Amino acid sequence: LQKNNTGNSSLEDMNSTNYTTSDYTNAIEKSRSSVVTVESDGSYYSGIIIAKEKETVHILTTTKATKNGSPNVVFDSGVRVSSTVIGDDGESGVALIQVTTNFEVKPFTILDTTALAQGANVVVMSGRNLTTGSAVVSGGIVSEPGVWRMNGTTTWLSSMLEMDTPITSIQEGGAVIDLNGSLVGVVASQPFQGNSRMEYAITANEIKLIYNALKTNGKVTRGALGVVVRDVSSMLAYEKSAQGINIDMKTGVYVQTVVEKKDAGDDLQVGDIITMIDGIEMTSYQDVLARMYMHSAGDTVNVSIIRGGESKQIGVVLQ
């Protein structure tokens, strides 16, 4: 506080205090108009504006908002419009809805989440509660970027952000942003297995694959290798040495865990390095993920691996 001529702090001085904005408030301000409220049978969820083509706007939200038909969408400006459901994905709990607008809307800028580091600050944003007019915002750090988690009913392993920030029901389907206001994930509504004290969001990289499938086909088909993998390029020299991997190796994905298989076919093993699938080079887990979205459960894929220092090919039946 500043003092007046008498040496005492004045009420006027206190009322004139200037509060500065932070990286968090700047990111929220930048992204606010790209988050919407999705209203379904008196319940409120969130959605993100993923794309705009002329007057057609595509919004991703939670399947909870679409289970009883087409929900209403309320933009941050307060404009309410009806929507059409394009498709939904029961595995991830993500749905795609479409609205028509005659006003300007702003889709999110999407970050390549392979660049997101452990310990990065993130903000989870909801649409506005239509009763109170307020929006829920919570902040935290990414405990694990790109962690693989299985939901409670299938063997599909989703690429997730594990975060230490609390999440409420209205934030389901909402945005996870970095401090530049870019989308890094969408809040998951499925019961993914993991640390019960953590919350999860589907990475923006996988969200793009889900969106493209829903937009094109109205549904998502995918196969699963049934393994948890890690980019070889992310492994430190001592980790490579411990696993017998050439320290100069920069591409491929390392098999960390094998999920119980239910189909016949050759098995991947812990310690395998996947270098190619169907003749396509696998430089990172994102390549593996994208390849799985081109297949369905029951398909057989040809997988090139390095096992025990030797190269070999195996046929894997996808789950």
Model regions and ranges:
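Short, well-ordered loop/turn sites that connect or cap secondary structure elements
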Residues: 65-67, 110, 116-117, 177, ...
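N-terminal, intrinsically disordered, polar/charged segments of Gram-positive cell-envelope systems
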Residues: 1-37, 44, 69-70, 150
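A conserved glycine-rich beta-strand in the N-terminal activation segment of trypsin-fold
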Residues: 21-25, 35-59, 80-82, 107, ...
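Terminal peptide-recognition signature
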Residues: 33-38, 47, 57, 61, ...
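Active-site loop architecture of trypsin-fold serine endopeptidases
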Residues: 44, 70-71, 105, 126-139, ...
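Catalytic-histidine neighborhood of serine endopeptidases
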Residues: 52-95, 99-104
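Short glycine/Trp-rich loop-beta-loop segment that forms part of the substrate-binding cleft
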Residues: 111-134
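C-terminal recognition in membrane/secretory proteostasis and scaffolding
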Residues: 1-4, 84-86, 98-99, 180, ...
